[in-house]
Amino acid sequence: MKLILAMFLCLALTSVAFADVFESPLTAERSKELAQVLSAMQQQKYLRGSFRQVRTVKKINRDFVSTGSFVIADTLGILWNMEKPFPSLTAITRDKMLQKNASGAVSQMNMKDNAVFGQVSQTIQGIFSGNRKMLEERFQIFFETGKDGLWTIGLVPKESVIKKQISSVVLSGHKWLEKVTLSDGDGNPILYEFSKVEGGISLTPEESALLR
């Protein structure tokens, strides 16, 4: 399962600001603000942009950096098109994970064949799409906002199945989701930084086919 998670996450140590969010459990008073943030994340049916991913492996004190583009397609799933250090394409939907490598070879895993992977995959989709119902069911939620409009959400899994793969998640942004930091089950941080994010651009025929 750790290999499967790495294939998808495949990510810069957490900053002090990120650590601080876990000192701010979600309260009833802040719940409305959180709802507004998550609603904004879900307003666009499609989001696309560029990503930079830094995966830190503490045992060898090394960072692995990759860059590329992404598409988050509402209820359909997520596309990760890695361009560097080598090209690969990953599509995650509710039913499957599909990967295409640089040579064009395709591999696919169906969720029904691996219930644990299916649960982890659906959780990751919910995190990136701002699915409040799923987040409340599966995570302890922490939330804070800054004077400049920056919001930060901290998530700690409730379920042992998820906690073995993802020990914590921190999301932050202004208008759009800008950064996500996941710590895997071994405490290795994985940082995603998003840029050039646009909403409302429809899927291409190829993208649509990959997510169906």
Roles of regions detected by a PLM:
Residues 51, 78-82, 97-100, 153-155, ...:
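Short hydrophobic/aromatic-rich beta-strand segments that constitute the beta-sheet cores
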Residues 69-118, 190-191, 196:
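An acidic-aromatic
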Residues 15-19:
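Sec/Tat signal peptide C-region and signal peptidase I cleavage site
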Residues 6-14:
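Bacterial N-terminal signal peptides
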Residues 23, 27-72, 77-79, 87-89, ...:
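N-terminal secretory signal peptides
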Residues 132-212:
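Gly/Pro-enriched, hydrophobic low-complexity segments
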Residues 20-22, 26, 33, 38-43, ...:
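Flexible, processing/modification-adjacent segments and terminal tails
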Residues 1-4:
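Positively charged n-region of N-terminal signal peptides that target proteins for export
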